[in-house]
C-alpha cells in the first residue's frame, strides 16, 4: 500500500506509502479528539465527517475487527519517514507501534485483535531509505529491504514473517485469520502472493507482467481485490522492465482487479487509463470502494476522489468531491463508518490527515 501526495501544482499524484518498521514497546504520544468538519454538498454518502489527525502525512488507516481501533502509518514530528501508529476510532489514545527505525508501511490487525502485521526496512538500515529516483518520471520506490513482520498491538514480541531477497510488503489478512496476502518481487516481477499467518507456505497468485499490489480480501473470504498495471506496447514493457531493474514502478496507470481466492473468475473492473488504487470491499461483498484521478481536469494538479463500483464492474459512482486528495478508504466491519485519508482542511500544504464519517446509503 502506498503514500500519496496531496494537491500541488508542481507535483504528480501518488507517492508510495512504503515504509519500514521495527518494533519495541509503544509509547503514548498524544491524546486527541475528533473534530467535526463541513463536507461538500455532493458528498451525500458521508455524514458527520470527523478529522482524526491534525498535521503530518497520515494514511492507510485500517479498523480492528471490533471497530474500536485504527492502525495507520504517519510521517510526523521527529519521524522523517513513515512509522506505524494506532489510535482509538475517535482519534484518541495515539500510540507509536514501530520503533522509529527505517520506513514502515501497510499495517493490519489480525481478526482476534491480538497481533498486527506490517512491512519494515529496519533490518536493512535504521535510517530512512533514500527517496525514489524520479529522473525518468514519477515513480514509486520498491525497496528491497522491506520485509513483513508480526507483533503485538503494543509493538512487542516482533516476529519476522518473510526473509527472501527483494521487496515484501503491502500485506493484509484474511477474515478467518489464517492467510496473509502480500506483494513481492521474489520471482523477478511485482506479484501477489499468499502465505500462512506464520509466514509459511507462500504461493504465487499472479504471473502477468506488470505491477500487482494493494490486495484485500472480501469479508466472506471468497474474493480478492487489488490494483494492477499491465504494460502492453513494446515501449511500455521496456519502460516497466527498465524501472523494475532500478527498483521502481510508475503508478500513473493502474486498474482495479478482482478474482476468487482460488484464482478463478479474474476480472478487470476499471479501464479508464487513470491511477485507480486502494480498493476495498464493502461488507456486503457486492461493491468496492476505491480512489482514482479519473476525473482530474487540471494538468499537474492531482485530484483523487473516492468511487464505488459493483463487483461486476457496473454502477460506478463518485463518493467524494473535495478538491485535492481523497484515498485509502476502508469500511468499519459493520459497514456503518468509512475511514480514509485526505488533504482537505490541512493546516499546511502537504498535510494528509485521517477522516471518518458515518456511511449513508
Task: Please give the residue ranges for each predicted region.
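Predominantly a core beta-strand signature of beta-propeller blades
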Residues: 48-49, 92-95, 138, 156-160, ...
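Beta-strand-rich domains and repeat architectures in extracellular enzymes and scaffolds
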Residues: 37, 48-80
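Residue-level detector of Asp-centered blade-edge/turn motifs that repeat once per structural unit
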Residues: 65-66, 111-112, 175-176, 219-220, ...
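Short loop/turn segments that connect beta-strands within beta-propeller blades
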Residues: 88-92, 152-156, 196-200, 260-264, ...
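Blade/loop signatures of beta-propeller domains
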Residues: 32-47, 146
Amino acid at each position: 500500500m502506498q503514500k500519496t501526495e496531496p494537491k500541488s501544482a508542481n507535483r504528480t499524484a501518488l507517492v508510495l506509502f512504503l515504509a519500514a518498521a521495527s518494533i519495541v514497546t509503544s509509547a503514548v504520544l498524544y491524546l486527541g479528539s475528533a473534530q467535526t468538519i463541513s463536507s461538500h454538498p455532493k458528498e451525500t454518502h458521508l455524514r458527520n465527517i470527523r478529522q482524526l489527525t491534525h498535521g503530518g502525512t497520515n494514511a492507510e488507516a485500517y479498523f480492528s475487527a471490533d471497530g474500536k481501533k485504527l492502525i495507520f502509518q504517519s510521517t510526523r514530528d521527529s519521524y522523517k519517514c513513515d512509522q506505524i501508529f494506532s489510535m482509538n476510532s475517535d482519534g484518541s489514545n495515539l500510540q507509536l507501534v514501530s520503533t522509529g527505525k527505517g520506513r514502515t508501511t501497510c499495517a493490519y490487525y489480525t481478526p482476534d485483535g491480538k497481533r498486527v502485521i506490517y512491512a519494515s526496512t529496519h533490518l536493512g538500515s535504521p535510517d530512512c531509505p533514500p527517496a525514489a529516483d524520479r529522473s525518468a518520471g514519477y515513480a514509486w520506490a520498491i525497496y528491497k529491504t522491506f520485509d513483513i513482520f508480526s507483533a503485538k498491538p503494543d509493538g512487542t514480541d516482533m516476529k519476522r514473517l518473510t526473509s527472501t531477497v527483494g521487496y515484501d510488503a503491502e500485506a493484509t489478512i484474511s477474515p478467518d485469520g489464517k492467510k496473509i496476502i502480500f506483494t513481492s518481487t521474489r520471482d523477478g516481477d511485482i506479484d501477489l502472493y499468499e502465505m500462512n499467518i506464520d509466514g509459511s507456505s507462500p504461493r504465487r497468485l499472479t504471473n502477468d507482467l506488470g505491477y500487482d499490489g494493494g490486495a484485500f480480501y472480501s469479508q466472506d473470504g471468497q474474493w480478492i481485490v487489488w490494483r494492477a498495471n499491465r504494460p502492453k506496447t513494446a515501449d511500455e514493457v521496456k519502460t516497466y522492465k527498465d524501472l523494475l531493474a532500478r527498483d521502481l514502478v510508475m503508478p500513473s496507470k493502474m486498474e482495479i482487479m478482482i478474482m476468487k481466492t482460488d484464482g478463478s473468475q479474474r476480472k478487470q473492473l476499471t479501464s479508464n487509463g487513470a491511477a485507480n488504487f486502494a480498493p476495498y470491499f464493502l461488507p456486503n461483498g457486492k461493491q468496492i470502494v476505491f480512489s482514482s484521478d479519473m476525473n482530474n481536469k487540471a494538468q499537474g494538479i492531482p485530484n483523487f476522489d473516492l468511487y464505488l463500483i459493483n463487483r461486476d464492474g457496473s454502477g460506478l459512482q463518485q463518493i467524494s468531491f473535495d478538491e485535492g486528495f481523497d484515498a485509502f478508504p476502508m469500511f468499519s466491519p459493520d459497514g456503518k463508518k468509512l475511514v480514509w485519508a485526505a488533504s482537505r482542511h490541512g493546516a499546511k500544504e502537504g498535510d494528509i490527515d485521517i477522516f471518518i464519517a458515518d456511511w449513508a446509503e
